[in-house]
Amino acid sequence: MLRGRSLSVTSLGGLPVWEAERLPVEDLLLFEVSWEVTNKVGGICTVIQTKAKTTADEWGENYFLIGPYFEHNMKTQVEQCEPTNDAVRKAVDAMNKHGCQVHFGRWLIEGSPYVVLFDISSSAWNLDRWKGDFWEACGVGIPHHDREANDMLIFGSLTAWFLKEVTDHADGKHVIAQFHEWQAGTGLILSRARKLPIATVFTTHATLLGRYLCAANIDFYNQLDKFDIDKEAGERQIYHRYCMERASVHCAHVFTTVSEITAIEAEHMLKRKPDVVTPNGLNVKKFSAVHEFQNLHAMYKARIQDFVRGHFYGHLDFDLEKTLFLFIAGRYEFSNKGADIFLESLSRLNFLLRMHKSNVTVVVFFIMPAKTNNFNVETLKGQAVRKQLWDTVHCLKEKFGKKLYDGLLRGEIPDMNSILDRDDLTIMKRAIFSTQRQSLPPVTTHNMIDDSTDPILSTIRRIGLFNNRADRVKVILHPEFLSSTSPLLPMDYEEFVRGCHLGVFPSYYEPWGYTPAECTVMGIPSVTTNLSGFGCFVQEHVADPTAYGIYIVDRRFRSPDDSCNQLTQFLYGFCKQSRRQRIIQRNRTERLSDLLDWRYLGRYYQHARHLTLSRAFPDKFHLEPTSPPTTDGFKYPRPSSVPPSPSGSQASSPQCSDAEDEEDEDERYDEEEEAERDRLNIKSPFSLNHFPKGKKKLHGEYKN
């Protein structure tokens, strides 16, 4: 979104319309450059993958992605083909003739965009020469021992070389190149230093130094204007990377960030105010299960319940129908991802549930990849015991059913004692004995390499959440990404999320936050913070986020202890909801997915391209300055109906409502009517100038 200007999601009612002149894409070439093209490392791959269809629909054959070549990724994700564009074909051929290995094909994702992949290893012999070129271009030296930075220099040099070959054969077509993150920034710096006729955009999804500082328990956001940036980068031995990032920012015609909170950070860390904020979206169609997401929730919840039965065998004294599944997922950044405050809140939640003698049990999953040796033997044994018991029950059921069937055919009601013989009783007793357990259920599914120093396990030991019988909160650390081929929890991430009740992401540093956004489009409530880009985005668009299943923890203006208490209250309030209240909340959450669709948020990228063309080629392209529409904007309103039983949604609800809610059935609730009201109300994006100044924290408050 343009700074100080309200762009809109025009297909939603109640929004001011931004009339943008369509770009002549048939006379343009668009390249997006990222280290995560066909190479998933973090969230940038999700951004590019989900946005690909929208961009490909707009640009057609003139849209290309540039990334690194890895043999495994090429075999499984890319279909090789010949370039149809003459300029691109000549550029690929020219580089291959000079000894580079350039691969071209279609990425096998929705939209099937073209990809150009460079083999870094085949060009490594040029490293010393390219280091000299880079030093002459911007005065930044790259240490020999930093292999990642050296790889980025090779990648950037190949990118700049390729773009030069393209512009030499473009036949009058103008070229736009968008570079994502500092890893791709070297190509931008070299392209500008060589004065290539290219309109450039640089997008930062997070600042290098910001991530480091936040991980050090520093009151980051309230001291942004006080940091000695060069000193901080030097102390962390990332000064050369910081210089590469900052040079990329200042060389670009247009600088964009993914959220307002990151825009503030970038202005202080990188010394340039972003021109456009480009919020991250999702391909909502990918996640939509038309009117069936409630049924999918029930189906995948049953699979999680199966895992829990095995994991807690011998201690399964809680009702699985009154058990809530919570989870946190992401990179293993203990403080940045909010795992520290989450664990402390779970300890307090456990105390509240026990004190109030609640019959609700909470099982919490930590899906955060870490270094492991192998699977935990106790965890594997639990799943084996569960499967064996299931097979035993099926065998007895068939035998019991046959005897019952024969008796009824004879016109007799069989004696129950005669149906089960001595062997059957012996089998059942052996099954019961097999479920006996002397030890507590493990808190981790794998054997950790650094068990004694692992932050999550160390905190679990401190707060005492060991999965005791008396605990109402149970904890399971799954230090590996989910996979449908896992012998423990054979589910993909999307299936797992749909089966859970609440995603909890109380991050301290989260430039955007895809995990709560993915929960939203799948109709799963989530917890986020006002320090995440997604949390700020929702606060500005939704009048009562909590009613729509998005709980926003204040981590900017409250002390860590107060934030922890607020999160505890959110979790405790969620535990007190009835089943039908949760069904209503999931319906409302799913409706917010309209806000996150790339079909709407993609227009901010469109504007960035307009802007960079007008700056790079002012004689050919002109962007008329437009003042903000005369409107105060709209918000998704507070829901007008409060009853906990949605009569209109019961057809798609897989479960019956709790008996204690029957007295509310006479209150009218029309799901479709409320949904239509909600879709007609939305607030336009806010201006950076209205962001409030934070409250100072006392020294040491962040060291929980």
From Swiss-Prot:
What EC number(s) does the entry state? 2.4.1.11
GO cellular component annotations of the record: cell cortex; cortical actin cytoskeleton; cytoplasm; cytoskeleton; cytosol
* Tissue expression per record: Specifically expressed in liver.
Q: Which GO terms describe its biological process?
A: glycogen biosynthetic process; response to glucose
- How is this protein's activity controlled? Allosteric activation by glucose-6-phosphate. Phosphorylation reduces the activity towards UDP-glucose. When in the non-phosphorylated state, glycogen synthase does not require glucose-6-phosphate as an allosteric activator; when phosphorylated it does.
**InterPro entries for the chain:** Glycogen_synth (IPR008631)
The UniProt entry's sequence similarity note says: Belongs to the glycosyltransferase 3 family.
What GO MF annotations does this protein's record show? alpha-1,4-glucan glucosyltransferase (UDP-glucose donor) activity
What's this protein's function?
Glycogen synthase participates in the glycogen biosynthetic process along with glycogenin and glycogen branching enzyme. Extends the primer composed of a few glucose units formed by glycogenin by adding new glucose units to it. In this context, glycogen synthase transfers the glycosyl residue from UDP-Glc to the non-reducing end of alpha-1,4-glucan.
PTM comment: Phosphorylation reduces the activity towards UDP-alpha-D-glucose. Primed phosphorylation at Ser-657 (site 5) by CSNK2A1 and CSNK2A2 is required for inhibitory phosphorylation at Ser-641 (site 3a), Ser-645 (site 3b), Ser-649 (site 3c) and Ser-653 (site 4) by GSK3A an GSK3B. Dephosphorylation at Ser-641 and Ser-645 by PP1 activates the enzyme. Phosphorylation at Ser-8 is not required for interaction with GYG1. Interaction with GYG1 does not regulate the phosphorylation at Ser-8 and Ser-641.
Q: What reactions does this protein catalyze?
A: [(1->4)-alpha-D-glucosyl](n) + UDP-alpha-D-glucose = [(1->4)-alpha-D-glucosyl](n+1) + UDP + H(+)
Gene3D superfamilies for the chain: Glycogen Phosphorylase B (3.40.50.2000)
What positions does the entry give for UDP binding?
Answer: 40, 331, 515
- Chain sites annotated for binding UDP-alpha-D-glucose: 205, 211, 331, 510, 512-513
Q: Where is this region: Disordered?
A: 620-704
Pathway(s) where this gene product acts: Glycan biosynthesis; glycogen biosynthesis
- This chain belongs to the protein called Glycogen [starch] synthase, liver
Q: Which Pfam families match?
A: Glycogen_syn (PF05693)
User: Which terms are listed as keywords in the entry?
Assistant: Allosteric enzyme, Glycogen biosynthesis, Glycosyltransferase, Phosphoprotein, Transferase
Q: Where is the composition biased (Low complexity)?
A: 647-657
Bias (Acidic residues): 658-675
